[in-house]
Amino acid sequence: MDLLRNIPDELICHILSFLTTKEAALTSVLSKRWRNLLAFVSNLHIDDSIFLHPEEGKRDRNEIRQSFLDFVGRILALQGNCPVKKVSIKFLFKLDSDRVDGWISNVLARGVSELDLSIDLCMDEYFLLSSKRFESKNLVRLKLHRLCIGQREKTVGWLAGEIFLPMLKTLELDYVGFYGDLLFLRALPALEELVIVDAFWFTTFTDVTVSNPSLKTLTMSSNIYSGSISFDTPSLVYFSHFKYVAKDYPLVNMENLLEARINLGVTEGQIRRAREPNNNDEVVLRFPNVGKLMNGIRNVQCLDLSANTLEMLSLSCESMPVFKNLKSLSIKSAENRGWQAMPVLLRNCPHLETLVLEGLLHFVTDKCGDACDCVSREEKGRSLTSCPVKTLEIKEFHGTMEEMYMITHFLDYFPCLKELKIYIEGNDHAQREVSEVIAEKIKLYNKSSSSNVQLMVSGYHE
């Protein structure tokens, strides 16, 4: 106990800030001094699972729930007007909005800079978050999980600018439902990072707009169909888009984009119908609009495309933009997805330096193009001969004969190739055998060519 008495108050508060609020409160048994210091802890972590012990069934007992709510109220009352930095509130049972509004209002008034709010109800229920309390000149990071934004009757509140967070830099929306479109970003003039994961709109095929002049990083991931999506984000430098194909992309303003990762979600049935000639399927007809998305990111320097995305681009080859700034291109392959768009894509990257292929095996069609060696044609390798790529990385390599033929194809037709990196799948023995075969192939190639390709072979790693 003598050691505890000698610990400075500031250090004790710092230690308590790493504990959940319940655990920090339990330290009051050590001394009355520690209980008083709880009022000055700058981080609050309120989690009902720690208090209610759901594995023991306590969450289902009303008196236990009420006891926890009373505990939260006492903690906030004890702290009074003391400044607070980080607050995390996580609940798995129903709360009345007035109580939550009161908690949020309390911590915002005390200058909270990071707020994480999660009220995870049952599968078909969502907590409707009010906007009337959301005004703060100190909040820098806000994360919302499994909440509803807007109002059922009309799209006001969050969506009509009733909030104002002038210092907010990071906004994370995880499994959040919207009534209306995403327009409240205008109330966030300093926003730099926006993450939207599994968001959905209660109104069918809503036209969504993401508009913010200061936004630098945008991540969107959703398995829900939507209407059109517009992006008016002129300062964006990083864009990650994992989503079903939108109905349209009317506006894509990303003039300063440096890096993009595009993974479009499609079903097997949609892929099959898209490959059919003159298909008038409503969903398939929207796929060529992906060309508008690609045109909007044409200034990108690093681009990562999924196998689905590459196949979808085959429906908009005629509108494929020239990626004049692109230095690094990474493409994921799949045996059930085609490379039809690969030739025009490579031809439209006049300054490409690094090409990363995550797998070589793909779905072969008569429109597979001249980028691979799958189909015999007179103009073999034409798209490769115009590509200035210097470094070729091949991942998920298994050493099959088909893959070996493709390695030879790349060596024959990439005129500027200087370095070949191959990451081999399989056990050590298989990797060693494949490495020896490839090394011999490179040796023979360098003897018969003016080039001097350097080979790097290793086991596959992320």
From Swiss-Prot:
Span of domain F-box: 1-47
Family annotation (CDD domains): F-box_AtFBL13-like
Biological source species: Arabidopsis thaliana
Gene3D superfamilies xrefs: 1.20.1280.50, Ribonuclease Inhibitor (3.80.10.10)
Highest taxon listed in the record's lineage: Eukaryota
Signal sequence region: none
Protein name: F-box/LRR-repeat protein At5g38396
Record SMART domains: FBD (SM00579), FBOX (SM00256)
Coiled-coil ranges per UniProt: none
LRR repeat windows: 118-146, 148-175, 197-222, 302-333, 334-359
Keywords (A to Z) from UniProt: Leucine-rich repeat, Repeat
